[in-house]
Amino acid sequence: VNWKKILGKIIKVAK
């Protein structure tokens, strides 16, 4: 699992 991609998506959604 690519946590970097998941975290990036979460950060984009959070913003």
From Swiss-Prot:
User: Which Gene Ontology BP terms does the record give?
Assistant: defense response to bacterium
Result after altering G8P: Reduced antimicrobial activity
Principal localisation: secreted
Q: Modified residue Lysine amide is at which positions?
A: K15
Q: In which tissues is it expressed?
A: Expressed by the venom gland.
Q: How is it modified after translation?
A: The C-terminal amidation is required for full activity.
Cellular component terms per the entry's GO annotation: extracellular region
Q: Which GO terms describe its molecular function?
A: DNA binding
Effect of mutating G8A: Slightly increased activity against S.aureus and E.coli, reduced activity against P.aeruginosa. Shows hemolytic activity
Where located? Secreted
Protein family membership: Belongs to the lasioglossin-like family.
The protein, known as? Lasioglossin-2
Q: Which organism is it from?
A: Lasioglossum laticeps
